[in-house]
Amino acid sequence: MLKEDNRFTAVELFAGAGGIALGLEKVGFNTILLNEIDKDCVQTLRNNRPEWNVVQKDIKELDFTGIEADVVTGGFPCQSFSHAGKRLGFEDIRGTLFFQFARAVKEIQP
């Protein structure tokens, strides 16, 4: 949905250093919320883009209902499935975070 400034909106989950939001910004999107749990990544985000709404919290603790966004993006951890790792899949807590991403999409309904 276009907002007052006629820009599409996005939410970025597992934001890391905000690479997806930066790319979307270049094509005119307004990222209205970035979620990241890692304190160093959050500090980087806040230092580089103080105007961004960065939420440092475990995604499992966030309620996304009521958030209006056109796009939900995110780079959820893949170590649990990577050939370079132990490939523990859903037995590794990181392997279950995809389901939190899916929950966010369901609650936001972009």
Regions found by a protein language model. Give the residues of each.
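Conserved active-site and SAM-binding loop architecture
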Residues: M1-P110
